[in-house]
Amino acid sequence: MRSIDRPGGQAARPTIGSVAGASNTRTRDARSLPDTPPLKAAAENFSFYYGQFQALKSITLPVYEKHVTALIGPSGCGKSTLLRACNRMHDLSPGNRYEGAIRLLPDNTNLLDPAVDPIEVRMRIGMVFQKPNPFPKSIYENVAYGLRIRGEKSRSVLDDRVEEALKGAALWAEVAHRLNEPAFALSGGQQQRLCIARCLATDPEVLLFDEPTSALDPIATASIEELIDQLRQKVTILIVTHNMQQAARVSDFTAYMYLGELIEFGQTRQLFVNPVRRETEDYITGRFG
């Protein structure tokens, strides 16, 4: 099993500026990060199998509270597989198998424990996918959906939570007058923010983003990135992205994965500018991947 570099790092390889230099004023290297922020979740010696194929190999990864952690690496390296394991999406397909644990703190719940209800896991850990996936319902009912599953029936409570979630997703001003319209009437960027609001309505502790801007235009992408920057004040975020400039812009910490293994983990600025592992350097400079 490969070791993980804790925040703070080790002796560095030659400087790399191409990716880090592309980041804007919101880049997380401008923030003063504590040496060891509090943990919100952690993968512990976690392996995953699609049938007989081992897709993830003994992953140990810290996820820090109210920070953004980016997962980068070439296609097929296991980024999305790891992300989906965090809220039990793999349970929906037969033949999949876990080893190890993914824990949510502070109660230290092993999210993979069969005794833990996957629906409750998905309430605590929301997920936003590559392409916007609003339900064939009204804007209002999309946001209220998770609350209704939880048994909420009070209209006043639902109204308040829907408004709060839409404001949290920076969408309220655009849809307040059209809550009963179909969600599919929204633009692609608005639909993605609606999906974020749907997650926020259940007050999640962690948000998972699986390439959330890959299907969006540059303006909508900038809007989602700005929203992620705001959301980190309230929730912990884990994001998969193929866009290394995006990882540099939005994340505090970055993990580089390859062939199902975690190769390197550290503060984003450090990993992009002074990676410890040669494999990481080759990937972020375009010599591989």
Curated annotation (Swiss-Prot):
Class in the EC hierarchy, top level: translocase
Q: Where does the UniProt annotation locate this protein?
A: Cell inner membrane
Q: Does the keyword Methyltransferase apply?
A: no
A GO molecular-function annotation: ATP hydrolysis activity
What SUPFAM superfamilies does the annotation carry?
P-loop containing nucleoside triphosphate hydrolases
Q: Where is this region: Disordered?
A: 1-37
Q: CDD domains of this UniProt entry? A: ABC_PstB_phosphate_transporter
Subunit structure, as described in the record: The complex is composed of two ATP-binding proteins (PstB), two transmembrane proteins (PstC and PstA) and a solute-binding protein (PstS).
Spell out the family assignment given in the record's similarity comment. Answer: Belongs to the ABC transporter superfamily. Phosphate importer (TC 3.A.1.7) family.
Return the protein name. Phosphate import ATP-binding protein PstB
